[in-house]
């Protein structure tokens, strides 16, 4: 009851004592609870800060210890303990190497974590062992005040850490849990929850930080690697414990309060293996915790834990996931497999559909049908034929008159059958790939067949089939008709010219005869004169001949006829 009343006066007293102590010291706190409890030794070395320790009074069943460091104001409260407690304030140093060793007088060895942190970091560790659990809470802050109180009848250990904008609740399983939570200063946050391993194996945690500071606006990066190793220890008992950490802007009425409203704390998941022999796996956790100032901290943590899916202890149930990865916006994302990578990962047995299958020679024992027979000079077996089947061999058997065999495009199968090795029956099957342009031309000529199949049009390279295909027989018919017509016209022209010429000749001959008759003047009728001309000429000739013979011989009949004709003419 006296401890709460002395709290306002003790910070002033301890402030003077701590300001005078500037030498490098080592702070050691030894808490010895009852005979049924364990002895915890904590060694902490800090840099550029001054610390104050507030140790609460342990109860008969569960003690509670809270420790915090500040730069400006420090407070320390010491309460009554059952056995003894020794406290000392460490001075600044260049590195921090805290180690926590917990031993049990009852022959039970708990987990022994070893932590190493960088400068400008305040670490507060509370070690406690109630036969089954070990809770360690670390809080970093630029200005903190610590007040601790303990009740005499609290059955479990409860530690509350107040930061800003984050609330996290972790329920460990069997053996121990270490919770490190950052606040305003650029520090790292690590959570490791090792559970009870089979046959008393423990987990040892080692952290190797590295911080690079480049001024007020530089980036603070922290890379830590957590490795888990197995150490044989005695078995542990199962007991339910709960550690809750909540955020508040002003105060916390449990044990520890820290007011940093502008410093968000990242949330992450921890992995806890279930009891039993399970193989260990590796997982990576990357966190980014920005502070209220211009500094940022990036934490990369590699945790090696055992595979566990679900763990339930007592009243509280906790689901643990192994291999959980949390990434900050600044961390690089993991590469995801793409469709291209999936296509590259296919087996090389799969052949491309555009590649033609190889040519082959198939031998048969019996001749199924009438085939050409090859007579050989020497006997050959099927293996001899296959050895001789090169490109020239297939060009000889697979080439035709109209189409030459192309080994890169076409496929040829030669089947040989024989009962006698000197006589082979050959059967050739050629799978020929047609040229697309030739196929288009062939389809253009088969419009009617395509319409029967329901095909209306065929296009190739922006070319379409013609709407109407002309009849090939119509052109020769037209040519024949035109030729016959021309021939008839030519014959008609020739006939007309010849007929006109003959008619002109006849007319000229008649005119000539009439002119000759008129000149003679014998008769009025030119027709008669023409007819008489011949007889007269004959008579004259006769007369001439008669004159030569000195005789005039004139037949009487001729004279009588001439007289009659003259009479008729005159009439």
Swiss-Prot record:
Record field: compositional bias (Low complexity): 84-105, 134-168, 271-299
Transmembrane segments: 477-497
Location of the region described as Disordered in the Swiss-Prot/TrEMBL record: 70-215, 239-299, 311-359
UniProt key word Glycoprotein: yes
Cytoplasmic topological domain: 498-571
PTM statement from Swiss-Prot or TrEMBL: N- and O-linked glycosylated. Sialoglycoprotein.
Tissue/organ expression: Expressed in thrombocytes, kidney podocytes, vascular endothelia and mono- and multipotent progenitors from the bone marrow (at protein level).
Protein location: Apical cell membrane; Cell projection, Microvillus; Membrane raft; Cell projection, Lamellipodium
Glycosylation sites: 187, 214, 296, 406, 457
Residue spans of biased composition, Basic and acidic residues class: 339-349
Name of the protein in its database record: Podocalyxin
Gene: PODXL
